[in-house]
Amino acid sequence: CTIDTSEVMDYPPTALSLGESTIQSKGGEIKFPIPIGTYGNFSFIQAPPKSKKTFFVSLLASVYLSGGNNFGGKIRGHREGRCLMHFDTEQGHWHAQRVFKRVQDMSVTKEVGCYKTFALRTVGYKERLKFIEYCLEQNKGKNGMVVIDGVADLVSDVNNLEESNLCVQKIMQLSAKYDCHIITVIHSNFGTDKPTGHLGSFLEKKTETQIQLELNTTNKDWVTVSCKRSRGYAFETFSFSINEFGLPFVVGEIYDPLRYFAPRTLTKTTL
């Protein structure tokens, strides 16, 4: 736990990024990716019900597997041969498999490498986090991005103070211990931009990046993605939609409420 202040430490490597930033150094200009998330940390997505959270998770997961694809715009994955672990806590096996297959369908290659998928609906809430930790331990040294959709199913009640605190502390511990980036999902309180319960409050306080989804005010078929909080540079706001094949895609890296962007049409040749 001791930190040597004289030690030269590198910035945590990036797992997912959107865009680049340039800084001035003694050696000149340095460009670096603006992180959505870095290894050794966790982020979370918050959104109202039925705002396509799982579609957005699929979009991020597919970009991570491929490094970048036609669906993700300027979002980039920095996988470096690591595994993607995808846990669905809510859906039954059929619906969960459909989500996992969507991620593969969006990949630029047929061989996606190490992509491990789990449906935890039948597992009790007390055992879900233990199971996730077990999977990370079994895959030690290979873990990259870990998706937990959604975090509320890891506790009995999002307003249980003790359980919520322990859950977030465990997520912090796992991300650091296994040098992975954990992305999880939680609902927003009705009519507000706050994540639900004590669990949401603890996530806000401890997260590296807080990602907010909102139904787009310009186009009802779009969802706007913004960086509500970040420990580093905030990524630019953008929107995504769902194409005719049921696959999510970025419709514009920068969201301008005064301008109308017609969603680009994806054809079978695009896929």
Give residue spans per PLM region.
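Conserved catalytic network of the ASCE P-loop NTPase/AAA+ motor domain
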Residues: 37, 76-80, 107-109, 137-140, ...
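Conserved inter-motif catalytic segment of the P-loop NTP-binding fold
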Residues: 69, 78-162, 166, 245, ...
